[in-house]
Amino acid sequence: MFAAGNVSGFLSSLARGGLQFVIIIWLQGIWLPRHGVPFEATPLWSGIYTTPLDLGFILLGPIAGAMSDRYGARVFASGGMLIAAVGFVLLALLPVDFDRLPFLAILALIGVGMGLFASPNTTSVMNAAPAHERGAASGIRATFQNSATVLSIAVFFGILTTGLAARLPLIMTRGLESLGISAPIAHQAASTPPISVLFAAFLGYNPLQTLIPQSATSTLHTHAKELIFGTQFFPELIAPAVQDGLHLAFYVAAALSVLAACASLFRGKRYISEE
């Protein structure tokens, strides 16, 4: 029970940490700028839009904890991770330019799943340890959880940039050429490393202002210049490439959640160490 709880907790934290990281990039770097939110306001609105995730967790956590004390943790923890997996798949099916209500509802669903898992899993891990060893058990549980959260940033950032790199050069080249930028200049701008593009979008910076020389736009119409160097064109330009990385990341998170549910099933029925 102790091992199963820690393994499932590790996998859950690995999926959840990556989710928060990827969604913030999605909102702050792509969706909010495309909908006219000023770059300086995107961090605030990213936090507001992810509130349903926390609300679902907060509301279901205490209820699941109380119920698991009576009926055992296995059903609640495993069921919660399966619900979270469904939520991740639904996120992967959303278009990059999603509607608000489905997005918020899916985040709430994932929060509910995580809330159903967290408290019962913690209780199960602690109950499996003798009373005189519960301090060490708590430390081991926290180490698994914190290590997974830190590791998830590297894992999901790598997944996101891998998906981005697959289509970014072609998409950027075609997008710039469609506005009248010459092929050599467009190709040079499109060769920017995917990590740089991702961070530029995340920080609210349009790198086209430095990647494309002013001389290359001297013959363009004024509207085309304003579009290229404005705040909305760059997020729209890279959105299809970012979408590939997002979908891959969410499917990986769903797989991790299913594995966490499977690991949770091995914890056995309700058990409290009497030592």
Regions found by a protein language model. Give the residues of each.
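Transmembrane core module of solute transporters
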Residues: 1-136, 152
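Residue-level signal for alpha-helical transmembrane segments in multi-pass membrane proteins
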Residues: 63, 90-94, 155, 160, ...
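Transmembrane-helix exit segments and adjacent C-terminal regions of multi-pass membrane proteins
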Residues: 69-74, 81, 188-275
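Short helix-coil transition/hinge motifs at the ends and kinks of transmembrane helices
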Residues: 29-44, 170-185, 228-239
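Transmembrane helices with small-residue packing motifs
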Residues: 91-98, 164-172, 268-272
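Small-residue-rich alpha-helical segments with characteristic i,i+4
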Residues: 8-10, 19, 103-195, 199, ...
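A general structural signal for well-ordered secondary-structure junctions
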Residues: 1-3, 33, 150, 165, ...
